[in-house]
């Protein structure tokens, strides 16, 4: 984890087959500004002082720990396919 200029804690990034993930711990004061019943847009979470590269989406609310914001973004096509971009016409075995 790393600390930002605003005492927020940014997790290391982790991923699955579809997405890259990270979570951000905000301060108690900032957690009071987080909407209770909906996800935030990029404009909203940036206005709270969260700093990340473009493309991250606030994707989940974890009720017991409202000060932990969960983010994800799609993996790039080259990461999903191991460096080879596949055409949409490929037939796969399932």
Curated annotation (Swiss-Prot):
Q: Which UniProt keywords apply?
A: Cell cycle, Cell division, Mitosis, Nucleus
Q: What is its main location?
A: nucleus
Database matches in PROSITE patterns: CKS_1, CKS_2
Report whether Membrane shows up as a keyword of the record: no
User: Mind telling me which Pfam families this protein's record contains?
Assistant: CKS (PF01111)
Q: Does the keyword Phosphoprotein apply?
A: no
**GO BP annotations listed:** cell division; regulation of mitotic cell cycle; regulation of mitotic cell cycle, embryonic
* Gene Ontology molecular-function annotations: cyclin-dependent protein serine/threonine kinase activator activity; histone binding; protein kinase binding; ubiquitin binding
A single Gene Ontology CC annotation of this entry is: nucleus
Q: What happens when the gene is disrupted?
A: Worms exhibit defects in the completion of maternal meiosis, embryonic mitosis and arrest in embryogenesis.
Q: Which locations, inside or outside the cell, does it occupy?
A: Nucleus
- PANTHER family on file: CYCLIN-DEPENDENT KINASES REGULATORY SUBUNIT/60S RIBOSOME SUBUNIT BIOGENESIS PROTEIN NIP7 (PTHR23415)
Family named by the database record: Belongs to the CKS family.
User: How does the record describe its quaternary structure?
Assistant: Forms a homohexamer that can probably bind six kinase subunits. Interacts with cdk-1.
What's its job? Binds to the catalytic subunit of the cyclin dependent kinases and is essential for their biological function. Has a role in the exit from M phase during early mitotic cell division. More specifically, thought to act by degrading B-type cyclins that causes breakdown of nuclear envelope and exit mitosis.
Q: What is this protein called?
A: Cyclin-dependent kinases regulatory subunit
Q: Which organism is it from?
A: Caenorhabditis elegans
Q: What is the lineage of its organism?
A: Eukaryota, Metazoa, Ecdysozoa, Nematoda, Chromadorea
